[in-house]
Amino acid sequence: LGFYAQDEWNLGNSLKLTYGIRFDNLMFDNDDLQRNDAIYELDFDGQHIDTGKWPDSRWQISPRIGFVWDVFKDKSLKVRGGTGVFTGRLPLVFFTNMPTNASMVQNSVTFKTQYDNGKVVGHDSRLDQLAGGMITDMNQIIDKFNLPTTIEKHVAGSKISGVAQDFKMPQVWKSSIAVDYQVPVSFPLTVTGEFMFTKNVNAVTINNINIKNPDEWKYNKLTTVKGADGKDVTTTELLHTGMQRFNGADNRMVYSYSLYDNPDKNVKYAGDFVHYNGKNAVVLDNTSKGYGYTANITVNAQPVDDLMLMLAYTHTESKEVSGLPGSDPISTWQGLNTIDGSNYVDAQRSQYVVPDKVIASVGYYIPFRHKGLLRGTHLNLFYSGYSSGGYSFCYTNDMNGDGINNDLMYIPKDDSEINFKTEEDRVAFWKFVEQDSYLKNHKGQYAEAYAARAPWVHRFDFRLLEDFEFKIGKTKHCFQLSFDIMNVGNLINSKWGISKSNTVSNSNRILKYEGVKSATDLTPGFSMYKVNGEYPTKTYDTYQNYSECWKLQVGIRYVFN
């Protein structure tokens, strides 16, 4: 439910103010929900998840104001801008995950007949209940199979999803300023500069409340031997209390660890002692972390009749805790690239941002003023240049022991900050680092999520459009015939207009964590990952996909009078 009010105020002939306020409220109905008591009884350090209740409905207020100032009152220089709060809505599939993961609203039942070499070897007699006509009434299906319609015993599933009771829909504070300047020359020439800053007010984040406070973490040595009866007997020896960190330059948090060299296979170190229980319990919540800005400059010109020129450059930065990469809260939480785990993420570069982009276009119109069907020809060439993707340098496996393979890599500044399994690994690693601009320029730092950019791709699109006009009686008919060649440069040269892929470097996962030196010396060791049995020597290679090739599109359009 939303309400909006807006007004304009002209201050003289040169300044116009526009101001307004919006009220939004997303309301919920709890009647169709039922609490799973088995989930609610789980204690996560005093927190409980109520799967039978949506967040509290609340009004969100979004005031805003904008202005346009005609500086010289002749439209040659305009300054415009504004500031305000804007409310959006996240994909509500993240809400519906709460009841669907509550083990209360759905159940899978499989009836099947088994065959072997065309012969029936197993038949579920319940299938006989389906003999006859098609059944579309759910109540008939329930009656035929005597399916339960009430929940007799609540059971907590392995995946639990919740929504914070005070959850708010996403809100951002946006501020912008722009200048439009008509350059005093003999032909139309306009230069526009724009800047917009965005700060998160209520962004969306997901936390796993099943992870204990780090001060409560325990690390154990587990030894398993055969007992007198031949059964395995495991003894536990406490090694550490309180969260541990790796030794050395890469001193990230340790959830669980293994030894670099552990010939005694019946000994395991640091089992899972950082969770309250065996359930993943993720909760949708809010955070104010994150911001973004965009700066743009655009030039438009018409130096001669029927010739239009445009050139624009845009620089964008965006930092966020989570871009919600998925539709399932568990996989979304696990999908974050992190250093210390998905619960300990600061604002990092958005995986969807394109930091720099250049576009340009040339358009020319050739009119035909003689009698005939053809009335004009439009020629257009459009250019776009940008980095085709942002990537993260991560380890190939789970270094910090949180059970998720999303650990951002530490980029050592020299040999003193990293231990390799072999000399060949060391040589191959440094050779790879020196050929990669991101790694080479960020030594001694943790790799930032999605901060490594693929090489720029330059693409041109060409359009030829013909205007046709004729009369039937007194009625004039117009239609257009167009020919579009997308990525026309690739038609000229098969190497042009092709983006780069990082599959040649195992998607930027070049180091494998091999474990720590000992139970008391948590210094990590690494090996260089091999792709198809060979050390990678370059980060990017040609992306071979039909989507990179040139395309021809022919269109026809009728223009109604």
Predicted regions and their residues:
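Gram-negative outer-membrane beta-barrel transporters
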Residues: 194-374, 378-388
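Structural signature of outer-membrane beta-barrel domains
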Residues: 24-28, 74, 84-90, 186, ...
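Outer-membrane beta-barrel "beta-signal"
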Residues: 547-561
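Short loop/turn motifs that connect adjacent beta-strands in outer-membrane beta-barrel proteins
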Residues: 11-14, 57, 71-77, 184-188, ...
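Solvent-exposed loop/turn elements at secondary-structure boundaries
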Residues: 31-62, 66-283, 455
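Residues on the lipid-exposed face of transmembrane beta-strands in outer-membrane beta-barrel proteins
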Residues: 3-9, 65-69, 177-181, 297-301, ...
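Extracytoplasmic gating/loop element in the C-terminal half of outer-membrane beta-barrel translocons
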Residues: 145-148, 270, 371, 376-473, ...
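Transmembrane beta-barrel strands of outer-membrane/channel proteins
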Residues: 3, 19-25, 81-85, 193-197, ...
